[in-house]
Amino acid sequence: MINEIKNDAKDRMAKSVESLKTQMSKIRTGRAHPSLLDGIQVEYYGAATPLKQLANVVAEDARTLSISIFDRSMIQAVEKAILTSDLGLNPSSNGQTLRVPLPPLTEERRRDLTKIVRAEAEGARVAVRNIRRDANADLKALLKDKEISEDDDRRAQEEIQKLTDSFIKLVDDALAAKEKELMEI
């Protein structure tokens, strides 16, 4: 029983941290990274289709993404989707591929992105703490039903607290790494 609660809490906390890392990877830094375009949807035969299903995106160098589109007739549609996205990117076409140069981030934009990253990290911390609260409530229910002793309850709560601390440290580490990446020029 106690192990099930701990394992469930651990799995849910891990998912929260993984979700944070995914969100952070979508936030643009000064470096070109293919995941930057993951959220872009392209109108393809009347349906919104993710760009990664229509093209191969690679980082050509530190400041340029190269997009090789599988269906050449889709170049204009992909270009339009990138232009209308809120990423502030301006692709150029050579008929075969699209090149997307990444403009350097301004100091103001870096600060804004840092605020966004901090808010994402705080959301992840809150999620981890809520999972801890749920696990502790489950333990209290077991204690109330006399399925576990008070000592077992206390021991399990301490272990869940250690889990919480370790996952919050992972969140803080991810935040520090992303802030450092954002502030690099």
UniProtKB/Swiss-Prot annotation:
Gene3D superfamilies: 3.30.1360.40, Ribosome-recycling factor
Domain of life of the organism encoding this protein: Bacteria
One GO-annotated biological process of the protein: cytoplasmic translational termination
Annotated Pfam families: RRF (PF01765)
Keywords: Cytoplasm, Protein biosynthesis
Molecular-function GO terms, alphabetical: ribosomal large subunit binding
Keyword Cytoplasm: yes
Gene Ontology CC annotations of this record: cytosol
InterPro entries: Ribosome_recyc_fac, Ribosome_recyc_fac_dom, RRF_sf
Signal peptide: none
Localization per record: Cytoplasm
CDD domains: RRF
Primary location: cytoplasm
SUPFAM superfamilies given in the database record: Ribosome recycling factor, RRF
Free-text function comment from the UniProt entry: Responsible for the release of ribosomes from messenger RNA at the termination of protein biosynthesis. May increase the efficiency of translation by recycling ribosomes from one round of translation to another.
Family recorded in the similarity comment: Belongs to the RRF family.
UniProt protein name: Ribosome-recycling factor
Gene source species: Aeromonas salmonicida (strain A449)
Gene coding for it: frr
